[in-house]
Amino acid sequence: MKIGIVCYPTYGGSGVIATELGKALAKKRHQVHFITYQEPVRLDSFNENIFYHEVSALDYPLFQYQPYESALASKIVDVAKFEKLDILHVHYAIPHASSALMAQSILKEKGFRLPFVTTLHGTDITLVGKDPSYKPVVEYSINRSNGVTSVSENLREETLKNFNITREIEVIPNFIDFSRFKKTD
């Protein structure tokens, strides 16, 4: 498969999980395309099946804040069309789910189908996502995702308690690469 992954490229939990998942998928011969504003810090080795696509937002004096959400949606459209992505996996709902939804709508008008899965990681729901300035967009984007996962049962319950979610949320717990971590005496 050709898989797009949108994530924060930092050492935070969602970025680490997304990058490690992408690396594992690439080892299984899937083509993985990371779409983000800088190369993920955990992309620390070469793999011929991993690609990085940088998102850059126009720095224009009119904008007090760069419109990253729009730039991300445009980059998703470009990568999906050029690379013929089969699916997109976005990690952390803000702003990735709404950017994916916008990109999906644009692509649909061009005759291209791109399903996307949103993985909820924590503060995108429990802290930032609940803020009234983001909540309606987060709720709408989650409900319009083709699939939704949560990294824990507790986060799933928090999401259902604080948002009007009509989609099923599948719990897929965080994982550990046991080849990297071994018990010591």
Located regions from the model:
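A short, charged, and often flexible helix/loop element on the N-terminal side
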Residues: 48-77
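N-terminal subdomain of nucleotide-sugar transferases
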Residues: 1-41, 46-54
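Histidine-centered beta-alpha loop that forms part of the nucleotide-sugar donor binding/catalytic region
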Residues: 8, 120-123, 173-174
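Membrane-proximal helix-turn-helix segments that form the acceptor-binding/catalytic region
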Residues: 131-148
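Carbohydrate-associated surface elements
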Residues: 38, 154, 175
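An aromatic- and histidine-rich active-site surface loop
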Residues: 87-112
